[in-house]
């Protein structure tokens, strides 16, 4: 890690050289801990792409703690520490991700809701809740019709 100032020679228009202090250049490769923190926040495909950048990034991307974070990002609370030794014996968190977690994530539908879709879903939920709460009591506990089916698109031909 070189944080010292660099000195360079600059040639002026009158053919005289003059010393000039240059600003130190920041390189992410000089800061291993920063690189680990950045890679730890990537998804699986981005982490694989980052491993192809250079040898250093490839070595850092093979770090098991990065893959552990990726595997258990969605799990709360985090599994116990005794699980770490079991996973290490079976090939590590990278193998766990590629053999178990990635295929499951690939099968899940990608839900990207717009603001209108979210508001519609919440409105339908409220209507459904009040129908169950109030209408059922008025009609002698008869099950009311629900509007929840409207959340899914209907193909009318």
Curated annotation (Swiss-Prot):
Q: In which pathway does it act?
A: Protein modification; protein ubiquitination
Q: In which tissues is it expressed?
A: Highly expressed in flowers and at much lower level in seedlings, rosette leaves and green siliques.
| Family matches, as SUPFAM superfamilies | F-box domain
Q: Mind naming one GO cellular-component term on file for this protein? A: SCF ubiquitin ligase complex
Subcellular localization is given as: Nucleus
Domain (F-box) ranges: 24-70
**Keywords for this entry?**
Gibberellin signaling pathway, Nucleus, Ubl conjugation pathway
Native source organism of the sequence: Arabidopsis thaliana
| Known role | Essential component of a SCF-type E3 ligase complex that positively regulates the gibberellin signaling pathway. Upon gibberellin treatment, such complex probably mediates the ubiquitination and subsequent degradation of DELLA proteins (GAI, RGA and RGL2), some repressors of the gibberellin pathway, leading to activate the pathway. Can partially complement the absence of GID2/SLY1.
Report any Pfam family annotated for this entry: F-box-like
Q: Name one GO biological process term.
A: gibberellic acid mediated signaling pathway
Keyword Nucleus listed: yes
Q: What is this protein called?
A: F-box protein SNE
How does this polypeptide assemble, per the annotation?
A: Part of a SCF (ASK-cullin-F-box) protein ligase complex. Interacts directly with SKP1A and SKP1B.
């Amino acid at each position: 890690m070189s944080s010292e100032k660099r000195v360079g020679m600059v040639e002026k228009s009158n053919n005289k050289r003059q010393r000039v202090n240059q600003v130190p250049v920041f390189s992410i490769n000089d800061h291993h801990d920063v690189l680990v923190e950045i890679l730890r926040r990537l998804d699986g495909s981005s982490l694989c792409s980052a491993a192809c950048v250079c040898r250093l990034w490839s070595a850092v991307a093979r770090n098991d703690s990065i893959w552990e974070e990726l595997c258990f990002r969605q799990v709360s609370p985090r599994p116990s520490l005794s699980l770490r030794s079991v996973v290490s014996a079976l090939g590590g968190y990278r193998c766990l991700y590629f053999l178990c977690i990635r295929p499951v994530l690939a099968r899940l539908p990608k839900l990207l809701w717009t603001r209108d879709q979210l508001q519609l879903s919440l409105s339908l939920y409220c209507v459904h809740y009040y129908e169950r709460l109030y209408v059922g009591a008025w009609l002698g506990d008869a099950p009311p019709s629900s509007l929840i089916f409207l959340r899914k698109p209907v193909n009318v031909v």
